[in-house]
Structure formats: C-alpha cells, structure tokens
Amino acid sequence: MKHSTLALLLLVLALPASAAPDYSRLGKDLTPIGAERAGNADGTIPAWEGGLTEPPPGWTPEQGYVDPFPDDEPLFTITGENAAQYESKLTAGQVEMLRKFPEFRMNVYPTRRTAALPKAVTDRVRERAGQVRLESFGLKDLGGSTTPFPIPQNGLEVVWNHLVRYLGGGVIGAGHSFPVRASGDYYKIGFRAMRIYSENMDKPEPNRLFYALGYFTEPATLRGTIFLVHEPVDQVAEQRSAWIYNAGARRVRRAPDLNYDGVNDGSEGMFVTDQVDGYNGAPDRFEWKLLGKREVYVPYNTYKLGDKSIKYKDIIQKRTINPELVRYELHRVWVVEGTLKQGQRHIYGKRSFYIDEDSWTVVAEDAYDTRGGLWRFAQHGIMQCYDAVLPCYRFGIFHDLTNGAYFVGGLDNEIREPRQYNAKGRIADFQPDALRRLGGTL
C-alpha cells in the first residue's frame, strides 16, 4: 500500500481533438471498454478475440496463477547491444536500463491479448459512456462505471480510467516485497492487504470509491503497523482520508503522508505513495497531456514469475530481477505525460505513463526529477486473473537509474494463501477505532 521526453514517438495513433466520441463503436471495431479490436498492420499485435476467461484445465487457486501458455518461446531478446533497432518501441526508462545495466534484458514473446472483464461490468461501461464527466480534476456521475472514458479526449480522462478500473469489487491477499540495494543486498517485507470497493460494503457511503486496510507481517521492525485509507470518487469535494496504527505506541493517528509523494514505511525511499498500483490518488498536482498511442514492449502475461516452484532467491538479483522470468509482449499503450503544476510540490517534475489499451492499466512509468533528468523507471507486469475475469498485477518494480538500486513488490511465490476476489466488507471494520482492535491481535 505504501509503499525524456519520449525518445521516439513513432506509430502515434492520437485521436483528433475535434472528433466527438462515437460510443456506438464499443463492442464493434472497439472492444467493450474502448481498445482497438483489430490487430496492427504487420501482424505483430493480433486482434482482440474476447480475452482469457477460463482457468487452465484442472487448475485450483492454491496453485497460484499458472502459466496458460507454457509452450511459448521468446521471439528475440533485447539487450544493450541491439537496443537501438528497437528503440521506437521502448520507453525512455527501458532504453536507459539497457544502456546502463547489462544485467537488464528483455525477452520478447508472441503477443496474447488476454485482457477480459465480466459482461455485467462491460455492459455498465457502455450504459454510462458519455454520462460521466470531469469537474476540474475530479470525477462526477461515475454511476458504477469502471471505464468512465472509453474513448478518451485528454490525458486526465485516461488517468481516471486507470484509477477506477475494475478490480473485482474487492480483493484480499498477502505479498512479499524486496528493497534491493545497489550492492545486491536485500531483505524481505511481508504485507497483507484488503481493498473493498463501495458496492461490496455492507453500508455503502456516498462519494466513496474504496476502503483499503493493510498491515506489515515482517520484518519485526515493521510488524503490526497498520494503514487505513478511505478513497473518495470526487476528489474535489473530498480528499483522501488515511490513518496509521503504530504498534509500538499503540495509537492511531492521521496519515497525511499517505498521499502524493509521501515516503512511507517499507519503501526505503525508492518510490512514493502515488506510484503504488501504477498510479493512485488525486491527480490534481499535474497537468496531464495525452501524447497518443504507441506500440511498446511491456511486461505482459507475466505468469512465469509467479510460479510457486520458483523461490525468491532465484528472482532477486543485482540491479534487476531475473530477466529469464519476465515476459515482454508488444502492446498498444496510451502515453500520458504529467507535468508538475506551477506552485505545486512533488519530487517528480514530470512523469510519462504507459497505459495498456486493453485494460486501462499502467504498465510502465518514466519519472523525472524537477531539473528534468530521468531519475526512476517503474514497470508493472500484468496478467489475466482468469478465475476472477480481470487483468491484475503480477509484480511492480521501481528502478533508481542513478545507482542501480530497485524495489520489487507483489510477489507471492512463497505464500500458500490464494488471492480472494469479490471480497465483501463491513464499514465497521474500516474505521480508525478498528485499527486498535486489529493491532492487539497481530
């Protein structure tokens, strides 16, 4: 929870600003949530044919998300030596990683457009298309849509599509994260979290998107620290509310740093609060510019990394995770550039987000310091959670391009408990007073 300018902008498929959205295209030449159904001209991106909606035969949740494509082989590998020939399909952060760190390479596999959502979810997107609106940087009249702007007209609309994307109504799960220093030394952080959306609460409250509660399970210095977030929909009318329970002091306090560029426990300062989940929180501190669409090699269908037979010691390496375990595919992504507004505060002066067209999920971020230098690079490997019928993150990794340190989170190879989607919640369990009760049991 607590956690450049683009080198080349080829294959830009930006929607003309003057074109009014034609929502009748949804489910026709566009997918139900607005991606281009057709493949690309040279056949390296196939047409979308409904995505992956069933688990492999014989699958059980205790196995974790096993790879439904075990026989796929890499088509080629991008390294620092051959990166120039692929640069038009790389992010600035990928180019810099390839240039600086020979340990980083990218195995590129055939593209499989596995993203899919339940029909009831996509039906609601279509019903609400054209009715949701922006007011300043906030969202109005969401009405249960999880893709408020399926044919986006500006960068802020794309950002909001990511922020409210469908994540199963509620999810409970545990994971391990690893801060990895430039020397290669690392340690393990355990965290358990639940995020319950308003519609899955026993007593839904107005203007509430979700409730999140999480706590550290290890190391001992962090164990028992609990976080609570109430996330609003309309962030003009109401800001995020957050609290923290400190196990040592046994008290609950407000947590204003659980927002924007706050640096939180367990992060080692390698990422900031609004980078969790690709991007989260109020988008009001940046001016958002839609640069269009690009074809980019991004971590996709990254099931192999979560194989329960693979131990963390086989994943964590110096300067990056084991590249043999990461699958890259060519996908169309929306590119949105955020520039820090005059008079606002944030450690990043500019950031470029790459958002998968099939799922509205942030899959990469180039982050620049306030002097304009490329500072950090994040990648978020996604996969289709076929039992819940939704795209979800397999891992998130934050690279410091200045020194080779990184932070990787979201791993659960050595955890037996499966994720639980469509989880329900009680409002009473997501109140500040409940943190003390929970803290006494940890």
Residue ranges and their predicted role:
Residues 2-9:
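Sec-dependent signal peptide recognition
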Residues 14-17:
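N-terminal signal peptide c-region/cleavage motif recognized by signal peptidases
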Residues 23-50, 78, 91, 213-281, ...:
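Gly/Pro-enriched, hydrophobic low-complexity segments
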Residues 23-240, 246:
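Solvent-exposed N-terminal domain segments of exported/luminal and surface proteins
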Residues 175-182, 186-218, 222, 276-353, ...:
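Extended beta-strand-rich segments in extracellular/periplasmic secretory proteins, especially
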Residues 414-442:
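Long, C-terminal catalytic modules of enzymes
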